[in-house]
From Swiss-Prot:
Listed name of the protein: Probable DNA-directed RNA polymerase subunit delta
GO BP of this protein: DNA-templated transcription; regulation of DNA-templated transcription
All copies of domain HTH HARE-type, residue ranges: 14-81
Family annotation (InterPro entries): Asxl_HARE-HTH, RNAP_delta_N_dom_sf, RpoE
Region (Disordered) residue spans: 90-189
GO molecular function: DNA-directed RNA polymerase activity
Bias type Acidic residues, positions: 90-100, 118-189
GO CC, one annotated term: DNA-directed RNA polymerase complex
Keyword vocabulary terms for this entry: DNA-directed RNA polymerase, Nucleotidyltransferase, Transcription, Transferase
Quaternary structure and partners: RNAP is composed of a core of 2 alpha, a beta and a beta' subunits. The core is associated with a delta subunit and one of several sigma factors.
Keyword Heme applies: no
Transmembrane segments: none
Amino acid sequence: MGLADFKDVDRNELSMIEVAHAILEDRGERMAFADIVNEVQKYLNKSDEEIRQRLPQFYTDMNTDGRFISMGENVWALRTWFKFEAVDEEVDHPEDDGDEESTRKHHKKVNTFLATTEGDDVIDYENDDPEDEDLSDDSDADEDDADDNSGDDYDDNEDDDDDDSLLDGIEDQLSQMDDDDLDDDEDEE
């Protein structure tokens, strides 16, 4: 089936995917996607704007249609041109073309924490917190203070005595109910 089969068909009724299949069949060779689109546009007499609007769907159709096969680098062919077993061999794998060292050099990650310059720009993780020195100086003083105090620092709260003698607060304003008061309330009902 090629473009000759469409001579009696209204071109407005043809889909881009059908025309692309016929073009590849007539050519009998692989084609770049851009060339396929240009040939389809010429055959269907579509404007650039109309092709641009339909291009995403057309590309999706080529990917999902089982009659087409991507050869890599946006080059397309018909699946019927290849034996089933040969399909994997015909697909171009760009990662297999070069040696592995060049691929690794290309994908080498940069460690931003390794600095090659000397000076203030280099981060010293062993001595990065200026407060560490202050804490170590304070801890020596705290040890000396601990020797002077024989008791626990936590039990030296002087505010404990104030808990028993509360000032006139809300507690004094609350009334307390006795069991007799509860019995009186039940009798009234």
